[in-house]
């Protein structure tokens, strides 16, 4: 599993932040959370959404990989990761290539989602929720044998 946070700009220069957890095997976004700030809660809430994902059965040796940002080195975050039964891995300091698939997702996301028309954080959240549904269930990917992430997951477990 991969996790990271990206900043988002919307109408009149307002900022929002998106935290995601991505399955690196299927490219499925398993959990995401949007906030208007970068407090620790953004990653803790993302972990809570991962925990409540009813379609998910985590492997006993699953690893959650991130950069070495302050959120991911926080003892509170690390404890919550451990409580989920995950092992934690972090990129080498200052090396974005270690989390390249997650960074790539954010790049595609920013190319495909137009948030400049959103006036409120609630509108941003709705756009992002709609995109995550589209990305996981309708957006075919060449590297997944031309399947969507959910189709590919189902293919792997069948």
Put a short name on every predicted segment.
Residues 75, 79-86, 110-158:
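C-terminal domain-tail junction helix/linker
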Residues 101-110:
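Short amphipathic alpha-helical "interface-anchor" segments enriched in bulky aromatics
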Residues 2-30, 36:
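An active-site-proximal beta-strand-loop segment
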Residues 57-73, 92, 147-148:
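Acidic/histidine-rich, metal-coordinating catalytic segments
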Residues 63-68, 82-100, 117-119:
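RNase H-like polynucleotidyl transferase catalytic core
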Residues 13-14, 73-75:
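Catalytic cores and conserved motifs of cyclic dinucleotide signaling enzymes
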Residues 14, 32-57:
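Active-site beta-loop-alpha junctions of metal-dependent nucleic acid enzymes
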């Amino acid at each position: 599993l991969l996790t990271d946070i990206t900043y988002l700009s919307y109408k009149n220069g307002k900022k929002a932040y998106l935290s995601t957890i991505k399955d690196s095997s299927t490219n499925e976004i398993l959990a995401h959370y949007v906030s208007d700030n970068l407090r620790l809660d953004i990653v803790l809430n993302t972990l809570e959404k991962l925990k409540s994902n009813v379609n998910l059965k985590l492997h006993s040796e699953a690893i959650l990989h991130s950069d070495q940002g302050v959120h991911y080195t926080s003892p509170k975050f690390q404890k919550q990761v451990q409580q989920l039964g995950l092992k934690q891995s972090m990129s080498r300091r200052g090396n974005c290539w270690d989390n390249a698939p997650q960074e790539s997702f954010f790049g595609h996301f920013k190319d495909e989602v137009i948030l400049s028309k959103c006036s409120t954080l609630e509108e941003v959240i709705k756009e992002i929720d709609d995109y995550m549904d589209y990305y996981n269930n309708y957006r075919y990917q060449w590297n997944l044998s031309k399947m969507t992430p959910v189709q590919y997951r189902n293919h792997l477990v069948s």
